[in-house]
Amino acid sequence: MRKKIMLSMLAIMTAVTVQAQIGYKGQVTAAIDGGITHLGGYVGAARIGAYLSPHSVLGGGVMFDKIRYDATQGDSFDATQWLGEIHYQYAVALNRFVLLPSGGLLLGGESCDRLSHQGNLLPYQNQFVYGLFAEFGVEYVFSRHWAVTLNPRFQYLMKTNFDNLKVSASIGLKYYF
């Protein structure tokens, strides 16, 4: 009986410790993720963030987005966007799950091939792009420092040669320092 009580107390202590390691003021996180867009492109991101309070996270990162667009008569071309992001997240901890609704600014550049895959000249130029995004992340904390993240994301680029509105979903890993 004494052994069962000790094991129960150890399990409770471990669960409390795991939860206490996530989301304290001054804590820093690093995350990477990858996924797809509704247009069939690929996205990836690397981010860092700092907890300003148990619920407020301020951070930044870099996002990559590559899409192949179809042109006329079976032709196609690739477009790439590199975007820096500044984001604010509101963290809601639910035991091992953390809900992270967030939003922020996107600033970066977009580039496109000069020639299509069939050799046709394209009318697009490399340019500076900017916009906004909203993300509704969920993470599952599986150890003191590691979490798996799922990030559905909506982004709106105000100045772009291509699609202004993109919907994407990505999965990744987050490390809590």
Where are these regions (language model features)?
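Transmembrane beta-strand segments of Gram-negative outer membrane beta-barrel proteins
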Residues: 22-36
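Solvent-exposed loop/turn segments connecting transmembrane beta-strands
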Residues: 32-44, 73-76, 158-166
